[in-house]
C-alpha cells in the first residue's frame, strides 16, 4: 500500500492518486464536544509540506465518497484504503467513547451513505493515545446499533503512538479487538529513525500468534529509506511522494517481490509468503 500523507483537501485526493497512491492518510480534528470537525493537520508537520490545507470533515467525506464509489464521475479505482489519523490529543480521556460514536455516525451518513452504495474504501481508525481505546468500542457499537454490522468488515485499527508492542496488545484486548490491525511506526521526514521497532512489529506479524496483521512505516520520501523499509518487510509505506515509492517498486530487486495492492487484496489478512 502506497499511502499518501496529509491528504486533507478534496483536491489532494486526485493529486496523490495520480502520483501512484492507492491509499491516503487524512487528519481529523475534534471540537470540545468530541465532534469530528476539520480535516486539518496544522504546524508543525513534515518538512517541505504545506500543512494548512483543510476542509470541514463532512465535506471531505462527501468528496472521499465520490472518489471511492464506482460509477461516480470522480471515481478513482486505485484508491482502496483510507487512514483517518484521529487527533484525539485535544480530548479528555473520558470523551474517547463519545468521539467514536460521533465519528461512526458521520461516516455512516456521509461516507457509507447509510449502507446504500456508499464509498467502498477500507477505513483504518488510527489513534495516537492508548488511553483512548474506548473510541473503538464507541465506533463499533454505533455501527451495530444503527443496523450496519456488515460495515465492520471495512474497518481496521491502528495505535500510532510508537508505544511498546506489548502495551499496544493490551489496549486492543481492552477494546475487544482481535483482528484488522495495522501497526504504524513513524517519525517526521525531518528526522531519521532506525527500523528496530519496525522489525519487531514485522516479527509479531509473522509469528502467527501476534496481534498485528499489517505493518506500515512513515514518513518515507527518499529512495534509500524506501528500500530499507521494503527490505524490513513492511506492507505499507506512507509518503509525501508516492511517485518515489512507485519508482523503487519498479526496480529489479523489488519488482518480483512486491506489487501495489488492489481492492481485491484484503488489508486485514496477514500476507503469507
Curated annotation (Swiss-Prot):
Instruction: Give the species.
Output: Loxosceles spadicea (Recluse spider)
Q: Where is the active site?
A: 5, 41 (nucleophile)
Q: Is Disulfide bond among the key words of this record?
A: yes
* Cofactor(s) the protein requires to work: Mg(2+)
Which EC number applies?
4.6.1.-
Q: Molecular function terms in GO for this entry?
A: lyase activity; metal ion binding; phosphoric diester hydrolase activity; toxin activity
Query: How is this protein named in the record?
Result: Dermonecrotic toxin LspaSicTox-alphaIA1iii
Lineage, top-rank taxon, reads Eukaryota
> Entry's InterPro entries?
PLC-like_Pdiesterase_TIM-brl
